Amino acid sequence: MLDNCYYINRHYRYIGYIDERTLQWIEKDLAFVPKDHLVFVSMHIPSSSTKELEFNALLPDETSNASSLYDLLKGYEAHLLTGHTHNNGNVVFNDSLMEHNTAAVCGTFWKADICTDGTPAGYGVYEVDGNKLTWRYKSAGYPIEHQFRAYPVGVSEDYPEYILANVWNCLLYTSPSP
């Protein structure tokens, strides 16, 4: 678990940043990890900002020096486990690097049991079997099979002729890859 909330003043203003000491520690630690092992890195703020995971223009939504972390993870199959956005999404950067940005167990800051992207409050479930990873989102108060909501034609003013679905354990692909 990395602390990438880097405070820049006394008024709780912070940016997403991994300090040099932590990067050096990761590099030394990875020297003992075989390249054929899965690597997981957990941190609060996402490594990269995507439109789909956009949070709040007033708060940092990416780690400013994430490329340094990506460089250290080259050669490994790596998964970044992040939060902060109160949205849910899985971003595939390339064949060996993926970020799982998991919605919040508190929903929208404990004010609603639904997150800002419509995902119910909940948490990620990750299962590792050797080098095989499976994951899914577990909505609080619902069975594990509860993975989306569908809305009938006519519900949306913007898309009145469409059936809409809010799927909260989807994959997003981004380029260029880190």
Language-model regions, residue ranges each:
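Short edge beta-strand/loop segments characteristic of extracellular beta-sandwich folds
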Residues: 162-168
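Conserved small/polar residues in nucleotide/adenosyl-binding loops
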Residues: 173-177
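His/acidic metal-ligating clusters that form di-metal
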Residues: 11-99, 161
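Flexible, acidic/histidine-containing loops and adjacent segments that form or flank the divalent-metal
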Residues: 1-12
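Conserved beta-sheet core of the metallophosphoesterase superfamily
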Residues: 57-156
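Divalent metal-coordination and catalytic microenvironments
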Residues: 2, 26, 84, 126, ...
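Flexible, glycine-rich phosphate/dinucleotide-binding loops
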Residues: 8, 48-49, 108, 132
